[in-house]
């Protein structure tokens, strides 16, 4: 038996590429985006009652990781990319039907549009459904997960004077918390866990319309070098 599903809308996100997206939602509160709804769900009637809700679940498609051949085992980044687990024991992007889910903060809404924060979604992500977060049912007090029982340790982030100034200027232009977004995302250490950084190597990612570059002066430290773009 097969079923077809259609997106109810698409995400417009601060994340223009997969690299440096937090591996779980809400780890970067400054990560903002909007969900633009498609007809007929762009009518305000579909959103009545959401003013009483602080967070929502988004069900979406990993549209850049869809595969014809299903994977039974995957290598989750949490385990360094060197150890494999059954696909259903992980939140890896390579899913049987390419479906993901994230809980995000609902900042506001109007007909056809939801404003969100704490997102971990790529720009252009197709969204399949929205469900309200229900604290008494969704927060399981005695839940356990021996694979990921706590947030991964963060990494220290420092700035060059130029990068700090650029982030402030672009934040004012975009009316977005650019410096906070960069710091919160880089503190998750986006490089592959198996990769030992070399001090001379520059890393980069595109956030909003900005190209952010950094390096690792030490394995336990990121230094933001420049924040360019917006031309």
Curated annotation (Swiss-Prot):
S-adenosyl-L-methionine binds at residues 22-24, 63-64, 91, 122-125. Pfam families: TrmO_C, TrmO_N. Keywords: Methyltransferase, S-adenosyl-L-methionine, Transferase. GO terms for biological process: methylation. Its EC number is 2.1.1.-. The keyword Methyltransferase applies. The keyword Transferase applies. Coiled coil: none annotated. NCBIfam families: tRNA_TsaA. Belongs to the tRNA methyltransferase O family. This is Putative S-adenosylmethionine-dependent methyltransferase RcsF. The gene is rcsF.
């Amino acid at each position: 038996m097969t079923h077809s599903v259609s997106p109810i809308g698409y995400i417009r996100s601060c994340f223009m590429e997969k690299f440096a997206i937090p591996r779980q939602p809400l780890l970067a509160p400054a990560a903002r985006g909007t969900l633009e709804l498609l007809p007929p769900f762009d009518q305000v009637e579909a959103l009545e009652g959401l003013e009483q809700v602080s967070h929502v679940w988004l069900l979406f498609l990993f549209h850049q990781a869809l595969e014809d051949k299903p994977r039974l085992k995957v290598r989750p980044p949490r385990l360094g990319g060197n150890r494999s687990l059954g696909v259903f024991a992980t939140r890896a992007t390579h899913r049987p039907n390419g479906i993901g889910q994230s809980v995000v903060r609902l900042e506001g809404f109007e007909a056809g549009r939801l404003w969100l924060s704490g997102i971990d979604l790529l720009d252009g992500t197709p969204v399949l459904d929205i469900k309200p977060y229900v604290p008494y049912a969704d927060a399981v007090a005695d839940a356990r997960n021996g694979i990921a029982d706590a947030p991964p340790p963060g990494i220290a982030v420092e700035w060059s004077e130029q990068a700090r100034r650029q982030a402030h200027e672009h934040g004012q232009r975009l009316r977005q918390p650019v410096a906070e977004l960069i710091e919160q995302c880089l503190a998750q250490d986006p490089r592959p866990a198996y990769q030992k950084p070399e001090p001379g190597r520059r890393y980069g990612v595109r956030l909003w319309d900005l190209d952010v570059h950094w390096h690792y002066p030490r394995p336990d430290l990121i230094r933001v070098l420049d924040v360019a773009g917006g031309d």
